[in-house]
């Protein structure tokens, strides 16, 4: 029985492990809050460079002072500041006037800043253009309602036109047949009348020839 008694203290061991897991969760949540709460380093650097009025540009030491004044931990995030400067220079948002790498002085690229402002203005213009387009859709519905009226009026007109055209065709065909038959008969009759006149003229020309021959015969005797 004495051997079974020491087995009981094994139960509090897992109880001690559970708070360790809770602490790990808390630290992870706190780290997430820290990351979400502060803006990225690149934004802070661009703001600090834009706020400076130096023509030659802002040095790294001046940047660190401006970031420390804004509440950013410069000592812990020194490497992040240098990486942020390099990335901004590679993107074209910052121009390095002096030095190489992260050490030197930096200025804002005016062309990149103006390029970022232009697309925003275009988006605003597109949003304004969309509003009148939506207002113009309302009168289109009214025109669509008016179209069936026009089609209803056109259908009886189409039915009347073929009937009138058929009547006109029938009327025009009947006088053409009457006119074509009359001149043909009239043309044939004068042709027949001219033929006997030509036959009558031929014997008249032959008669004087016979008389002349008879008169000449007694002279030969």
Swiss-Prot record:
Keywords, comma-separated and alphabetical: Acetylation, Chromosome, Citrullination, DNA-binding, Hydroxylation, Nucleus, Phosphoprotein
Residue stretches spanning the membrane: none
Modified residues (Phosphothreonine): 18
Top-level taxon in the UniProt lineage: Eukaryota
PTM annotation (N6-acetyllysine): residues: 17
Region (Disordered): 1-42, 92-221
Amino acid composition bias (Basic residues), ranges on this chain: 20-36, 120-141, 150-161, 170-187, 194-221
Principal location: nucleus
Post-translational modification: H1 histones are progressively phosphorylated during the cell cycle, becoming maximally phosphorylated during late G2 phase and M phase, and being dephosphorylated sharply thereafter.
Compositional bias per record (Low complexity), positions renumbered to this chain: 1-17
Disulfide bond positions: none
Statement: the UniProt record of this protein carries the keyword Nucleus: yes
Citrulline: residues carrying this PTM: 55
InterPro entries assigned: H1/H5, Histone_H1/H5_H15, WH-like_DNA-bd_sf, WH_DNA-bd_sf
Any GO BP: nucleosome assembly
Annotated positions of the N6-(beta-hydroxybutyryl)lysine modification: 33, 35, 53, 65, 86, 91, 107, 141
Single GO molecular function: structural constituent of chromatin
N-acetylserine: residues carrying this PTM: 2
Classification via Pfam families: Linker_histone (PF00538)
UniProt-annotated location(s): Nucleus; Chromosome
Coiled-coil zones: none
SMART domains: H15 (SM00526)
This protein's domain notes: The C-terminal domain is required for high-affinity binding to chromatin.
Role played: Histone H1 protein binds to linker DNA between nucleosomes forming the macromolecular structure known as the chromatin fiber. Histones H1 are necessary for the condensation of nucleosome chains into higher-order structured fibers. Also acts as a regulator of individual gene transcription through chromatin remodeling, nucleosome spacing and DNA methylation.
Name of the protein described by the UniProt record: Histone H1.3
